C-alpha cells in the first residue's frame, strides 16, 4: 500500500502534491509507476519470494520493476488518497541521462510483457526515450500545467 504526498524543495518549501490512483491494476503501470516509492509498505512475506533486481538494465528503476513483477504475480496493491508523506523534489536537479532512459525502456518492455500489456505497451515503453528528445524546459512546463511535477 502507498499514499499520496506533498512535494517540497529548499527554495520553494511545500509547492505541490502528487495524488496517486487509489485502485491499481496492470494498466496502472503504463504511463508511470502508480506509487510513490518512499510511501510504500509491504507485508514481510512479499520479500520471501521477491527481491529488488539491481543488475544492469534496471538501475534506478528497481522499484518500478518490483512493483510490476508483484502485480504480474497476482499481488494486490492500492494507494491511500491522504497525503501522509513528504517528498523532496527539486525541479532544478531532475535531469535524466539518455542511458537511464534506455534502462527504463528495457524495464518497461520486459515487465509490460509479463503483465500481458503488449502490443499496447510498446508506445508507453518508448515514452522515456521520446521524452529525451523534448527540451527539458518544455517538459517542465507541461508537468506544471498538468500538475504532474
Q: Which residue ranges define each predicted feature?
A:
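Short beta-strand segments
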Residues: 2-4
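Juxtamembrane helix-loop transition sites at the ends of transmembrane segments
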Residues: 57, 109, 134-137
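Membrane-interacting alpha-helical segments
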Residues: 102-105, 116-123, 127-135
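Terminal low-complexity segments of carbohydrate-biosynthetic enzymes
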Residues: 129-149
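Catalytic core of nucleotide-sugar-dependent glycosyltransferases
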Residues: 87, 94-118
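Conserved nucleotide-sugar donor-binding catalytic segment
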Residues: 6-11, 16-99
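Flexible domain-boundary/linker segments
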Residues: 17-18, 64, 87, 121-125, ...
